């Protein structure tokens, strides 16, 4: 007599399943994306999800890490490749206009939109910490440029960093509300006009975000 096989784990491609989970959280947010939603879009059973990723919160944590390494990595690249805060943040905002409106994935930034109406304190706190870490990186780079003379001595680094973070977060919400790439690019250019004129170094008098720009204090690994 042959025994019937039971409980055999379903075979699936883990990276593909993780990508599908990313799309679900990005589109609908953490709170409103249920485990049943996740198993449906990932094409796996609930036991397979728990075995491979843990619970919903640990899956989301992995999604956020992967997002920071992929879709959200443009901010870190700008800070790693540009010589000044002005050009790094200007580039980051321009690239956000492209990334946030890319039709290949949900609009806006996952780390911003996924936190809306989130009632899970640990998730909300983690996303807030990541966003604030980005602003701290902006401020550190701005302060370096003030010290080097790239920006005027009376530049309010804290306020300018907060302003830049607010613009980035606002661009994400604008994209979610239907703003197109040209509108967000115009917003980015306008935001850079608020920066003080360049100090004693190269690019004197320029308010364009297209100049040189960045530093080791980068938002890389936290996403933009």
Regions found by a protein language model. Give the residues of each.
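Hydrophobic alpha-helical connector segments
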Residues: 62, 76-107, 157-164
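Short coil/turn segments at alpha/beta junctions that flank glycine-rich nucleotide-binding fingerprints
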Residues: 28-31, 82, 148
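Helix-turn-helix
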Residues: 2, 16, 20, 24-58, ...
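Hydrophobic alpha-helical segments that form the core
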Residues: 107-117, 155-174, 186-194
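Short, basic, alpha-helical segments at the C-terminal edge of helix-turn-helix-like DNA-binding modules
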Residues: 65-71
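Amphipathic alpha-helical packing segments from all-alpha helical-bundle domains
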Residues: 72, 90, 121-148, 158-159
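Amphipathic C-terminal alpha-helical segment
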Residues: 99, 144, 164-182, 193-203
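N-terminal intrinsically disordered/low-complexity leader segments
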Residues: 1-12, 155, 199-224
